[in-house]
Amino acid sequence: MVYAFKTAGAAAEQLKNLEDVTRIAQKTADACHSVGAALTSCTIPQAGKPTFEISEEDMEMGMGIHGEPGVWRGKLRTADEIANEMVDMLLADINPNSGSRMSVMVNSLGATPLEELYILYRIVKKRLEDVKVKIVMPLVGRYATSMEMTGVSFTFCELDSELESLLQAPAYCAFWSVV
């Protein structure tokens, strides 16, 4: 969603017609692959209670940003183990060619501090370098949170020249600055 907003916004800024902006937004969405891992739930204000329960010793892999169930729930793992499993899932989905270009987002789901995100990014960077994927414009921070959830999501956005150009186009806002 973040990548689609950026590329569609850049296309609109270039005065592309609505059909082109829509095409670019869809192309970007199709190029994005995400997976999340959570250590805690979040509380949606309208509900007033956590969206799901999870013990302090457990985690959930593959859950959705709104608390949708993941692919497995089990014992908490190390940051490196979590990052490696998430990268494995994304690479299996994408199967990139050597020389592919991707933007990578390591996103806090709300309560995960920046320092921990950089620990996870270290694994992402190494793993993509190992398969000869060039990382373009890495993003590490809070881009799409789930209230106070402790967790992380990884998004890999496959880039061609059109999407890369739009992603790197100037943007000036509190959320995203490219100069």
Can you annotate each of these PLM segments?
Residues M1-H66:
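Internal, active-site/partner-interface "lid" segment
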Residues V2-Y3, K16-K27, E56, R77-E85, ...:
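Conserved active-site and cofactor/substrate-binding residues in soluble primary-metabolism enzymes
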Residues H33-G36, Q46-E53, E57, M86, ...:
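Short alpha-helical interface elements
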Residues M89-V179:
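C-terminal non-catalytic interaction/assembly regions of soluble proteins
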Residues K27, T40-A47, T51, D80, ...:
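A sequence-level detector of short, solvent-exposed, charge-rich linear segments
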Residues K49-I119:
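Glycine-rich phosphate/diphosphate-binding loops and the adjacent beta-loop-alpha structural elements
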Residues E13-R23, I54-I65, W72-A83, K132-S146, ...:
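Hydrophobic transmembrane alpha-helix bundles
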Residues A10, R23, K27-D30, S34, ...:
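Charged/polar, solvent-exposed surface patches and flexible loops
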